């Protein structure tokens, strides 16, 4: 059994990147939703995007070696990779969890506001946390932030924080989002675009690589989540990546 929607999502990603549709026959999906506790179909999202990257790698491998292969992606394994920060170990240690704040001091997350609306605060970075606390005039306790937001509407809190460049957002229904100017703008945009930013001679790659992207060198200047994940994915398939954060 597999999720038909994963095939549909992959097809959209693959064709949007102007890749040959015939290659999609090399992909196999296994597993069904739900894979993670969510109102969103995170398993389908994980499965289709990972398959797109893996298929691209397989196509490059075939162009360099002449060897074709089938790409198989299990929905549970794909979903686990979307929570990889919980499983990654560096020299045997999970360094991402060594300096976590105590729950009562962690103000990142979702809050109910005075109008029964909700807001999400992004406060994982120390400077964001400091500025949010200063703007709301709260101490470092989550309870203090919660009490303050109960005196404000979700929209008021959003405006107060975003007007000075802080990452926070009112949680909206599908209908509310579709009426929002940003919702209108996003609806008119493709999921992604590929823009050529300069001309250069094609890199000559060897025909006997050990990995699909062997010989590719990448300088990664991104910072949060999606950006570094791109660099990590390239490295997984054999590219040399330097991440400057």
Regions found by a protein language model. Give the residues of each.
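Acyl-CoA thioester-binding alpha/beta core of soluble enzymes
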Residues: 1-245
